[in-house]
Amino acid sequence: KATSGYLQEFQDIESKLSSDPSFAGWWEIHNKLVKWQLNFDEHSDTGLGNILADQIQSANRAFIQFIENGYSNWVVGQNRPQMVHDTIPIAVAPKLNEGKKVCLLVLDCMRHDHFMTLMTELRSLFDIVIDPSLALLPSATPYSRNAIFSGMFPNEFCKKYPEQVEAMQQEKGVNRFEEIFLSDQLSRLDLANVKLHFKKIWKVSEGNNYQSHVGDYLDSDLMAIVVNFIDILAHARSESEVLQEMVPDESGYR
């Protein structure tokens, strides 16, 4: 079933790739490819893994062209896809304005395919709506994460916060202004009175400890939590033979 299903959808994906897809079209393509990655994780004997990997590489090359063709216009115009620095105005501020409490959870380095493996568990606890947005360039942590909390493109927040430019040269300082960025953005959105709780979690043990005390912060209007240990694992894997043996490929990472 997995074999016949993918072979049928293979041509549909190829057709969409050749149709100059919009951002919404690219999201549809990406979802289809991730779906088959997860399917083949469970049915590794299909013999189609290499074909899927080649199709993903082909899609990546075409997506790069999509970014190259559009990015310079997106950074100066309003007619653009939703991007990560739109997160607070679009996803958070409206709920705060309605008087709702919000928990903003940023899982650094968690990919969409990783998230999809958690969906079964999460759906039993939450009503889930996935609203995609486009990463900024560079997509590295110092730029993308700071963009989320500042609500600005990197050149904009570097101009507004010149001390951040110097901090970016130091590995331990690249994201030390995030709480300030978020507070300032809330003020610009007329949400200065929001009670904010901001927390960074670097290790699993810290996460477990935080979980046991999370009730202390439930009176906050906005809980913003950054989880770093997925990103740390990703970087450590490239330097550790033990981790490479434990997580030999993308399937193992999921």
Could you tell me what each predicted segment is?
Residues 1-102, 109-254:
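…; additionally, a secondary subgroup of soluble metalloenzymes is captured
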